[in-house]
Amino acid sequence: MTDDAVREFHRLHAAGCFVMPNPWDVGSARALERMGFRALATTSAGLAWTLGKPDGTLTLEEALAHLAAIAAAVRVPVNADLEGGYAVDPEQVAAHVTRAVGTGIAGLSIEDASHDPDHPLLDLDLSVARIAAARRAIDESGTGVLLTGRAEGFVVGRPDIDETVRRLQAYAEAGADCLYAPRISSLDHVSTLVAAVAPKPLNLLVNAPFTTVQEAAGLGVRRISVGGTLARTAWRSFLRTAQQIADGDFTSFADLPDVDGLLGDPRG
């Protein structure tokens, strides 16, 4: 990470709307950078699948190694999907955030899912304390890394827009620079959240064709990410082609992309 990358990441959030796609490895990160995207974000799901694991089973060490590899591979700002900080206790979250900012990232997100099916969201007071601890760790690092607070209600089967607003506003007050509620797909809800967290920026996950960049920007969204969707589309192509091969059909081998040409010679 350079100071320039952190400054650029903050600048991107100040006005307008930008798309921040989610690569799942170094190759996809470099390809996206060369396509002109101005910032990238990691995806815990995409990384887990690459490692042969389901989403939600990454270890802290796996995540940190991945962050360091992606951040070192590109010049654009990288936002880290740090899931729930790989801890529940706020002080442990702070310690893990300190390690994460040392990998070279320009931003990171902390979510409030509990992974307890009976109580899928952490209590609000605890969630706020975790965001505040992450904020303190970033401030003490002197890096200026941008902090995103995530409200996971719509992900974990608690699609309550009022509770989502309450949580995002509390995370903003606790020091989050950007706010994010994944799986929001109602444009009315998007407008509600934009207004609720203003003047701070809102990240919108677009993992289905429910809006466009122009429409989201018109609603006041500042940042668009796609989560694990790019990785899913890669898996879709892989599985379809693998099944065709299993059936003795090699026609999908036509018109393949020049990946070497896209990525260039890393020795050059």
Report the location of each language-model feature.
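Extended, intrinsically disordered, low-complexity segments
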Residues: F9, G228-G268
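Alpha/beta enzyme core
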Residues: T2-A80, G84-V226, T233-L239
